[in-house]
Amino acid sequence: MDLSNLTLTKIQELVLTKKCKIYDILLAYKNNYELNKDINGYIEFFDDSLDIAKRYDDCLKNCELEDLPLIGMPIAVKDNISIQDKSLTCASEILKGYISPYDATVIKRLKNKGAILIGKTNMDEFAMGSTGEFSCYGATLNPLNREYVIGGSSGGSAAVVASFQAPFSLGSDTGGSVRLPASFSGILGFKPSYGGLSRYGLASYASSFDQIGFFSHSIEDIALILKHTCGADKMDSTSVDIFDDFYPLKTEPLQGKNLALIKELSEDLMDKNVASSFAKFKFDLLSKGANIKEVSIEEINFILSIYYTISPVEASSNLARYTGLCYGKRISENLSLNDFYFKHRSNFLSEEVKRRIILGNYLLSEGYDAKYYAKACEILQNLIIPKFNKLFESCDFIITPTSFVKPFRVGLDFDDPVKMYYSDICTVIANLIGAPAISLPYSKDKEGLSIGMQIIGRSKKDFELLSFSKNVIRELGLNGI
């Protein structure tokens, strides 16, 4: 049996029936990590995870399970999520050497249930990027074809699951940073409703949109981990309860489900391979009895402008804390305070991060804040969110491709931010309206690259979305892509 090709639920079954040791499972993932270092998915694989595995094996041997429903389940973690006594760098030179003094709430909940955190994964610096190339540790490559990008910003978390270096991983999703790399690497990528998972311990990028998300090969695994990590948290005032009676996930026919298709996301705008795959996806759903209705939401035409107005403003505010005075790397030169700030941030932040900070500060400057930032917030709250709320009164889910484009070649669009930002046009919708969304692997092109399809659900109806996605995978025969 290949121990590195297991779902979490299968690991649970093998461990509880004592057919396999947790240590042997973790060792299999460690060996896969050693064989696939060129992908650059991990920043660090935790060697002490093997010691924890031995300890849990002893607990199982002595029948000392306590309340550990996730015992022995290996999970990789994006490097912007805090794990006590582990490095937290957000893949930035400016934070190298920083050790987190506390656990994020999601991490604490996983540890308390018996999960084993096996490593920190690579990412675009401070979660800013859509290719996985903007990291001080180097680019993460696509396991399906190493000449192409994995997508970002949670590229490392996607890569380690896609290459079976981990069965499950945590990422963060601000505008599609979980779903895009999931689509590019042929796995599942899930973003919960805004507030569904506590953001305490997640390094902030754009606080209005940030959300921890999951990568997996299994819908059941996503639902299991969501069940044990979701819920309100006193450390995060935006957190909400989302658990409902759709868990365990329901097996239902697709017959009669009402799906919406947004007219403005025209197939004419898509890469031809994406367009043909999306057309087939729609046909497959219709053949199973689902109803698909085309709706017009004109505000989609400037949804990227809204996102790339609000998110840089929040980023410029959130990243102001990285001064070099309290934590992270520090210049030792004798400089004035202003010169210290200037040199420190100029030397230790990447071009993409500086680009977004400068844009955010510009949009907040006198005379422009009301013209751009305030206007964007007004349009979002008064037009976009109400329109989607109205749409969900008559439909169950929205379907789109995960991205209009296929993966870029490594380095090809490094200096073309507009093209890179355009890859987010479908995914930012869920972040702006606070809804749950998932990317399903649907097809592959002649280069072996994956094309994913996105399903967006109602806010706080995450398990309903996961149940529907499970049934789409089952009825369309998408397992094993």
Swiss-Prot record:
Active-site residue numbers: K78, S153, S177
Protein name (record): Glutamyl-tRNA(Gln) amidotransferase subunit A
Designated gene of the protein: gatA
This protein's UniProt keywords: ATP-binding, Ligase, Nucleotide-binding, Protein biosynthesis
Family designation: Belongs to the amidase family. GatA subfamily.
EC number: 6.3.5.7
Listed Gene3D superfamilies: Amidase signature (AS) domain
Presence of the UniProt keyword Protein biosynthesis in the record: yes
Catalytic class of the enzyme: ligase
Organism, scientific name: Borrelia garinii subsp. bavariensis (strain ATCC BAA-2496 / DSM 23469 / PBi)
GO molecular function, one term: glutaminyl-tRNA synthase (glutamine-hydrolyzing) activity
Subunit structure: Heterotrimer of A, B and C subunits.
